[in-house]
């Protein structure tokens, strides 16, 4: 799910995108985050791949800017965890340049028998008004 070129629906309306900061990989808990629930908010578009290191490869920041060139207040940012923390910062800065309000998808874990199960849950949208 990278570089989805279709940005309008059959009625010609802009379809929101979910910009995934980095493609999920197996985490320290031994499982890979499932982004299927995030797809209900829009087409998934990966910004950074697992081997990308924008902290050490300056050319990757302009690549992210190109991928996110059409980011708007109707779109979402999603960080699935892991990856280069600088990638998160780059995506947030690009999003804030493009839109006064940045919507993010936050993972809400299910409560099961008093404990939160990291593998089960849903994405909750949060709007961050960064400027008026």
What are these regions (language model features)?
Residues 79-89:
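Acidic, metal-coordinating catalytic cores used for nucleic-acid/nucleotide bond scission
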């Amino acid at each position: 799910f990278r570089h989805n070129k279709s940005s309008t629906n059959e009625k010609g309306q802009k379809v929101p995108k979910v910009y995934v900061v980095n493609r999920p990989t197996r985490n320290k808990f031994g499982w890979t985050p499932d982004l299927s629930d995030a797809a209900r908010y829009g087409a998934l578009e990966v910004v950074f791949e697992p081997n990308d290191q924008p902290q050490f490869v300056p050319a990757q920041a302009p690549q992210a800017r190109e991928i996110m060139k059409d980011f708007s207040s109707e779109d979402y940012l999603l960080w699935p965890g892991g990856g280069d923390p600088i990638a998160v910062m780059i995506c947030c800065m690009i999003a804030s340049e493009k839109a006064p309000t940045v919507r993010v998808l936050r993972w809400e874990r299910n409560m099961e028998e008093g404990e939160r199960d990291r593998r089960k849950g849903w994405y909750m949208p949060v709007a961050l008004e960064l400027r008026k």
